[in-house]
Design a protein with these regions (language model features):
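Extracytosolic low-complexity repeat regions of secreted or lipid-anchored proteins
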Residues: 206-256
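Primary recognition of N-terminal secretory signal peptides and signal-anchoring hydrophobic helices
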Residues: 4-7, 15-188, 202, 216, ...
């Protein structure tokens, strides 16, 4: 009886470990950068499962939730997944996953290779490291080498560059998709912190998408109204000479994407003259 119990117990353990195991020793690298995540990847049925945000952000896909259904979009690709279902719809065509997406500790786990390759990235596994190479981000057919952001402070300023393709594309799309109504140029606007007055618009940050030679492909400047109770943000496109209303939520989304890009090692400080 004791031997029988031991055999049954061992078989039970083998079943558990073969279906799901923690991939604690596995590192995920995107374009050479080690990705930080608050939930460990898991191996389930020989598939690497990762938190949805880890993979979606790094391949530049936008996520939309509706009940237990998640929709990922990027350019002309649209993918619909459901929790606890192996059915997936890609641009209207049904396919089937080897492993169903699932929720664990308030994180949605999805098959990493499927999501990465669907959105144009290639995946390689070697020596406990999963390497994802993302598809280059382009604007009007020109490859974006970096997103440069420049801030002027009370004393000095900071210039940084982000080279994460997925993050840069998500930031660009946030600008494009959240343009409000066209407005006239403000009567007074400045980037000089010492000469801004109540009612003036101050440039908070300048975003410049650069090509491989460091030339500007597209630039966006964000201005905010100073010294008055109402919060108003304007988006300026210098090349077109056009101004738009822009939302605080969209601005915060951009800053959050930059924070996560920095956390994952994609942001480099080019210069910092602040004391």
């Amino acid at each position: 009886m004791k031997k029988m119990f031991s055999g049954v117990f061992l078989a039970f353990i083998l079943i558990l470990t073969s279906s799901t195991s923690y991939a604690a020793t596995i590192q995920i690298k995107v374009d050479g950068k080690t990705i930080v995540t608050d939930a460990n990847p898991e191996i389930k049925n020989n598939r690497t499962m990762v938190p949805l945000r880890v993979i979606s952000e790094n391949v530049g896909a936008t996520v939309h939730w509706s009940d237990s259904q998640v929709t990922l979009t990027k350019n002309d690709m649209k993918v619909i997944l459901k929790l606890k279902s192996n059915k997936v719809v890609k641009n209207g065509k049904t396919e089937y996953l080897d492993v169903k997406p699932y929720m664990k500790n308030n994180r949605t786990f999805v098959p990493m290779r499927f999501i990465a390759e669907t959105f144009g990235s290639h995946v390689d596994y070697k020596n406990g490291i999963v390497s994802i190479g993302t598809k280059p981000f382009t604007i009007d057919g020109v490859i974006v080498s970096a997103l440069q952001q420049e801030y002027h402070l009370f004393m000095g300023g900071v210039v940084e560059q982000s080279k994460g393709n997925g993050y840069n594309e998500a930031i660009y799309n946030t600008f494009v998709e959240n343009k409000g109504s066209k407005v006239k140029a403000p009567a007074n606007y400045t980037w000089d912190f010492h000469n801004v007055s109540a009612g003036d618009y101050y440039k908070n940050v300048q975003f410049d998408f650069l090509d491989q030679e460091g030339n500007s492909i597209k630039r966006f400047d964000l201005y905010s109204l100073r010294g008055l109770e109402q919060l108003e943000i304007l988006l300026h496109e210098p090349t077109e000479g056009q101004w738009y209303l822009f939302s605080e939520n969209a601005q915060q989304s951009i800053y959050q994407l930059l924070d996560r890009a920095s956390m994952n090692g994609f942001v480099t400080v080019i210069s910092n003259t602040a004391p």
